[in-house]
């Protein structure tokens, strides 16, 4: 008689055969990966593996499979063990545990393991139904509906099952919990004979009790409904020389979300346990579509000799193509250096992708082959009665376990090698490992301006189009009605007449600069480029060009043929200079990433646009910026310090705080006005910028290249990994472009000249200083100094005229005024909202006027009258404590702690200390933070900090000494104050007046 052939549980009535299989396109939606695994205890005594080693494999399995939530059973965890695990994996994992009250380390136990990279554990609610056997969590994933999961570990004794399943529902109702979305875990029971080999039916009473619970909860075995005839098992054992297999581990889902589940997997892991992991992905109905994003070459691959050899070989072919083109000079519209370069970058990406796919591993291919063979064996109808077939399946299962263990071991070895080479070194690898990661934010919806107020767009592709259209249309916002070209040009020229002749270099001065974008300039530009920055659409990082340059240098030293990347880039840049950018090359294309700021999350205007450009584009513009270094000091007045070599933001900050003290001491009444430009870099009109460059006598050789770059500039907007169609950049200077800062400085300089030239603005007249103080700038941050006799309307009219011509716009809502001078004057300005008491109308209510004690943030520092020195420091202390707490979890050595303190404590305090000093009590608090971090909060430190401050060769640690560092900063200020050359800063001269005024008469 032929053995029974299982048919499986039939699908629900009316449901298609693959009711649980999600269409392929659904895999492109945002989804959450959920898994279940019986881990068979805390440690693995059979393999002499410690609990921490085992948990490292659990973490590795979650990381590799991008599992957000893993339900685990037979955890054998108590609070002490969870604390130990947290010390090792607390930055990445969070454990929500339920243990039995007695002997938790020896039996039962269920837990949810949360991947902090994907889910914020603070938002998870926990409810215990049965201690150590049934646990519920409830959480929200992004902005979607809440998800409720039940993790179960059923008793081994099936006679206890009816009571167990009934108690779960009773406890759920008693605790007021809604029906779960999923029930997952080790059920120690199968409902269908097909889920066992040999096939047989389990205890009918236990099955009925489980089915009654499922019916009450509205749940079904979704995987079985999707694959009614497939054999797959999660547990294997050998009993009396008989191999038995069963699908004890399952994920039940509610009927409501069954069609939203996909990518079901039952697979072996490297975790030492006798169970396999079952997992699935859930894509909520409202989840946004997720695009492929953009490709980028990982810098870790650049040390692979095989890959770099292939790229270098393709580079040598490019060199030959460029030489051939130079000799042939065929039609440019067919081929030219720029198109050859674009083809090279495209081939480079293909080479890198192919290499990564190939090196993904022979081991992975072996694993897939074993999985395929196992699936074929499980499909054999004789598996229930043929012991040889079952033995073969068991052998392959063990082989799969061995291969998975090797794969995990190899990954650990690779990571260990990376940490050995790069650990406790302040660079990308170490800092990345110890970074406090947060779940990725998804843009759920955007308000559609083409519909009513309640209209929202949820599709990522259409959201990307909405964002694209917004930024394209923004370029035309605020532009006055069109005038004739002649009138427009005349308006610009009239505005530029404010620039004094002394700021316009002569031809002879300009001829001293090399405007050719030479090989030397490109080399310097590459050297100055910072590694680790995000790439443009081509995916090529700076590190690639640097690595190719190093390989060429090595080839030259060994008298071998190499690929001269610097010469190639110089050739491409020269072609752009002479012929302009070829639009087919995509050279000037960029992509924009909107980053949420504040207010309504569905309004695209509340997102900061971050622009990312190709690195070859930025190398060209960095070389162009280097050409402006020499003449820029004549072109731009010393009042502007933004991104200009040898000019410092700290001098501007010190001047503002010194003027506040000076005005009060000398009873010079007035105001300091902090102006804010709205989207400053995005507003400058190009025709105004070109006229400005021409007025400043910038050679056409330079401006021609810049104009070509902007004429061909296009931007794509990325939303949830989806790239929009490009739009042309017709206004503004591009963020992320090394040249943009200097271009903006030149564009705003006519306004600064206009303010300095205005006779109706007294500004502040300081004895002994010929030029009155009226304006300071750091790029777009504009600070005005006005006397009590000035009128704000005068400033407003000047700004309005310049904005009309330049396209800029000042943000009244962010304008802040600090009254200075006598206390009576300061109070009067705040109460009357008038700078000049004779002003007919008060200031706009949107303008903030700072009263005594109110700190105003200016250029990264805090200034004002009678401002507490605690204003910025408490926040910084909190940030340092949190950051050091994250680092502490990596258990760094003393040497590593020294580097961390240098980076965190030094980095967080350096700017503010130099800008406005550090109070003694803050210094003491920071020393306490350092002491606690070094000695892990030990109340009796083994070595005093004063000994750790000593150099390494003097038995010290060379630890950051905050007091000494602060004294060094003070000495630098003293040095600058004592500088008596013509370059002496105005704040130092004002300080002289204050010192003289404070000195006793006759001294």
Describe every region a protein language model picked out:
Residues 402, 417-602, 619, 782:
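Surface-exposed loop/turn segments and immediately adjacent short secondary-structure elements
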Residues 604-636, 654, 678-681, 730-762, ...:
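Conserved pre-motif C helix in the palm subdomain of viral-like polymerases
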Residues 138-147, 181-182, 205, 243-246, ...:
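Surface polyanion/phosphate-binding segment centered on an Asp-His-Pro turn
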Residues 87, 226-243, 721-723, 811-854:
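Short, conserved micro-motifs composed of acidic
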Residues 1-85:
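N-terminal, active-site-proximal structural segment of metallo-dependent hydrolase catalytic domains
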Residues 306-349, 779, 840-920, 968-985:
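Basic, alpha-helical interaction scaffolds
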Residues 57-102, 163-256, 320, 325:
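Metal-dependent phosphoesterases centered on the DNase I-like endonuclease/exonuclease/phosphatase
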Residues 926, 941-1003:
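Extended C-terminal regions of large enzymes
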């Amino acid at each position: 008689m032929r053995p029974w052939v299982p048919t499986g549980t039939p699908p629900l009535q009316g449901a298609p055969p693959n009711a649980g299989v999600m269409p392929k396109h659904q895999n492109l939606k945002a989804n959450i990966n959920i898994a279940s695994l019986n881990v068979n205890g805390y440690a693995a005594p059979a393999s002499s593996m410690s609990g921490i080693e085992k948990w490292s494999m659990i973490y590795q399995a979650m990381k590799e499979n991008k599992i957000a939530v893993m339900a685990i059973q037979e955890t054998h965890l108590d609070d002490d063990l969870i604390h130990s695990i947290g010390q090792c994996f607390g930055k990445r994992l969070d454990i929500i545990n339920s243990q039995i009250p007695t002997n938790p380390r020896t039996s039962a136990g269920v837990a949810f393991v949360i991947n902090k990279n994907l889910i914020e554990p603070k938002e998870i609610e926990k409810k215990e139904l049965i201690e150590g056997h049934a646990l519920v969590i409830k959480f929200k994933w992004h902005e979607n509906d809440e998800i409720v999961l039940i993790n179960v570990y059923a008793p081994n004794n099936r006679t206890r099952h009816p009571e167990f399943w009934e108690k779960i529902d009773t406890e759920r109702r008693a605790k007021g919990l809604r029906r779960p979305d999923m029930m997952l875990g080790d059920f120690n029971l199968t409902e269908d004979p097909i889920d066992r080999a040999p096939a047989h039916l389990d205890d009918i009473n236990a099955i009925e009790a489980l089915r009654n619970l499922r019916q009450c909860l509205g749940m079904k075995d979704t995987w079985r409904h999707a694959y009614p005839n497939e054999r797959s098992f999660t547990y294997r054992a050998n009993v009396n020389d008989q191999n038995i297999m069963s699908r004890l581990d399952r994920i039940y889902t509610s009927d409501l979300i069954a069609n939203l589940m996909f990518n079901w997997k039952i697979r072996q892991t490297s975790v030492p346990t006798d169970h396999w992991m079952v997992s699935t992905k859930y894509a909520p109905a409202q989840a946004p579509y997720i695009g492929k994003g953009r490709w980028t070459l990982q810098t870790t691959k650049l040390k692979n000799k095989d890959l770099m050899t292939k790229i270098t070989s393709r580079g040598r072919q490019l060199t030959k193509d460029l030489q051939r083109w130079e000799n042939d000079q065929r039609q440019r519209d067919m081929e030219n250096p720029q198109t050859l370069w674009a083809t090279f970058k495209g081939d480079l990406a293909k080479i890198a992708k192919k290499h990564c796919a190939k090196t993904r591993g022979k081991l992975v291919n072996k694993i897939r082959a074993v999985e395929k063979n196992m699936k074929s064996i499980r499909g054999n109808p004789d598996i229930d009665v043929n012991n040889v077939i079952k033995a073969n399946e068991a052998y392959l299962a063990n082989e799969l376990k061995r291969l998975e263990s090797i794969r995990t071991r190899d990954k650990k070895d690779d990571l260990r090698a990376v940490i050995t080479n790069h650990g406790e070194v302040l660079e990308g690898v170490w800092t990345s490992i110890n970074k406090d990661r947060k779940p990725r934010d998804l843009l759920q919806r955007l308000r559609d301006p083409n519909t009513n107020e309640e209209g929202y767009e949820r599709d990522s592709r259409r959201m990307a189009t909405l964002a694209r259209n917004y930024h394209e249309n923004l370029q035309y916002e605020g532009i006055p009605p069109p005038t004739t070209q002649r009138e427009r040009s005349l308006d610009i020229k009239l505005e530029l007449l404010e620039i004094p002749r002394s700021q316009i270099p002569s031809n002879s001065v300009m001829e001293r600069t090399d405007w050719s974008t030479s090989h030397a300039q490109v080399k310097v530009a590459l050297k100055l480029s910072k590694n680790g920055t995000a790439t443009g659409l081509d995916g090529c990082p700076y590190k690639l060009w640097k690595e190719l340059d190093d390989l060429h240098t090595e080839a030259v030293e060994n008298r071998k043929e190499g690929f001269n990347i610097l010469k190639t880039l110089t050739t491409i840049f020269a072609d752009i200079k002479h012929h302009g950018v070829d639009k087919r090359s995509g050279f000037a294309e960029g992509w924009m990433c909107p980053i949420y700021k504040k207010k309504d999350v569905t309004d695209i205007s509340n997102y900061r646009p971050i622009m990312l450009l190709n690195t070859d584009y930025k190398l060209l513009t960095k070389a162009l910026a280097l050409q402006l270094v020499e003449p820029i000091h004549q072109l731009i007045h010393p009042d502007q310090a933004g991104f200009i070599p040898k000019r410092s933001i700290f001098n501007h900050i010190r001047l503002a705080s010194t003027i506040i003290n000076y005005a009060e001491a000398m009873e010079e009444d007035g105001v300091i006005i902090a102006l804010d430009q709205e989207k400053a870099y995005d507003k400058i009109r190009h025709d105004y910028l070109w006229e400005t460059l021409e007025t400043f006598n910038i050679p056409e050789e330079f401006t021609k290249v810049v104009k070509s770059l902007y004429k061909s500039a296009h931007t794509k907007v990325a939303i949830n990994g989806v790239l929009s169609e490009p739009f042309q950049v017709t206004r503004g200077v591009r963020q992320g472009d090394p040249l943009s800062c200097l271009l903006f400085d030149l564009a705003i300089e006519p306004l600064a000249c206009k303010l300095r030239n205005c006779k109706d603005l007294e500004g502040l007249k300081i004895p002994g200083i010929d030029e009155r103080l009226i304006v300071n700038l750091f790029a777009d941050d504009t600070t005005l100094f006005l006397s009590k006799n000035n009128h704000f309307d005068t400033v407003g009219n000047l700004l309005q005229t310049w904005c009309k011509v330049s396209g800029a716009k000042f943000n009244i809502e962010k304008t802040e005024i600090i009254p200075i001078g006598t206390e009576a004057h300061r109070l009067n300005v705040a109460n009357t909202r008038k700078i000049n008491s004779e002003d007919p109308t008060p200031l706009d209510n949107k303008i903030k006027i700072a009263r005594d004690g109110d700190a105003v943030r200016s250029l990264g520092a805090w200034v004002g009258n009678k401002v507490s020195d605690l204003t910025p420091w408490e926040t910084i202390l909190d940030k340092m404590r949190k950051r050091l707490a994250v680092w502490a979890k990596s258990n760094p050595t003393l040497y590593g702690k020294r580097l961390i303190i240098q980076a965190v404590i030094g980095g967080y305090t350096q700017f503010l200390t130099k800008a406005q000093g550090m109070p003694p009590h803050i210094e003491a608090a920071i020393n306490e933070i350092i002491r606690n971090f070094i000695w892990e909060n030990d109340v009796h430190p083994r070595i005093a900090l004063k000994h750790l401050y000593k150099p390494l060769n003097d038995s010290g640690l060379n630890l950051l000494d905050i007091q000494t560092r602060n004294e060094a900063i003070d000495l630098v200020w003293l040095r600058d104050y004592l500088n008596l050359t013509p370059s002496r800063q105005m704040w130092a001269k004002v300080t002289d007046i204050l010192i003289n005024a404070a000195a006793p008469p006759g001294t």
